[in-house]
């Protein structure tokens, strides 16, 4: 990845994705408010651990497919671009369904599991990261490099949400804490239905 402008564009896209509300951020906030900062940070670290796994698997799969069918990269570019547009429009006009889904496990495992079972994470890694690959000779290494950038940006976002939510809501009433839990379960139901 020698082209700084491509890396810069990727970082901007990733920052906009990492700091926008989603399942992991909702879980980080919920755990931070309900159980404290430590649990929110554990979710963030669990999610980052899941992202390492997703990075390695998706990079390996994409590299294998690319070596078999080099032209597939064009289709992945198109699909990735369409996915970015779809997510942008879906975010603008989203409404929330009401289904109650709970994860009964420790915070680290909750973050890890939620990241691994979230199909949107897999789609992002499989379709968006290849858009920013500039050299097909180093395809695998560039995907892993982009995955590492993604993991660090997501981790910074998740830690920021954990620290801020635990600080601002530490003295909140039980009513506010229940509202945050309900909001999380609604978001989770909405995200897994899409």
Where are these regions (language model features)?
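Residue-level hotspots within the lipid-embedded alpha helices of multi-pass solute transporters
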Residues: 14-18, 115, 151-158
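Single conserved hydrophobic/aromatic residue that forms the stacking wall/gate
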Residues: 186, 193-194
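Hydrophobic alpha-helical transmembrane segments of multi-pass membrane transport proteins
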Residues: 144-165
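Membrane helix-loop-helix hairpins that form the core translocation module of multi-pass transporters
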Residues: 38-110, 164-167, 171
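Hydrophobic alpha-helical transmembrane segments in multi-pass integral membrane proteins
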Residues: 57, 117-123, 187-188
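Juxtamembrane transmembrane-helix termini in multi-pass membrane transport proteins
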Residues: 2-71, 127-146, 169
């Amino acid at each position: 990845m020698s082209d700084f402008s491509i890396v810069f564009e990727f970082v901007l896209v990733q920052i906009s994705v990492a700091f926008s509300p989603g399942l992991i951020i909702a879980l980080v906030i919920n755990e931070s408010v309900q159980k404290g900062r430590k649990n929110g940070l554990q979710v963030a670290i669990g999610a980052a651990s899941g992202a390492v796994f997703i990075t390695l698997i998706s990079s390996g799969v994409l590299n294998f497919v690319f070596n078999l069918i080099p032209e597939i990269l064009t289709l992945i570019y198109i699909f990735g671009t369409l996915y970015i547009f779809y997510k942008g429009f879906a975010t603008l006009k989203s409404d929330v369904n009401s289904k109650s889904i709970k994860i009964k496990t420790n915070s680290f495992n909750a973050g890890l599991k939620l990241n691994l079972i979230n199909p949107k994470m897999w789609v992002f890694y499989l379709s968006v990261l290849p858009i920013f690959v500039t050299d097909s000779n180093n395809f695998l290494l560039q995907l892993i490099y982009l995955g590492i950038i993604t993991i660090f940006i997501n981790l910074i976002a998740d830690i920021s949400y954990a620290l801020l939510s635990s600080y601002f809501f530490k003295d909140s009433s039980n009513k506010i804490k229940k509202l945050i839990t309900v909001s999380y379960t609604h978001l989770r139901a909405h995200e897994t239905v899409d």
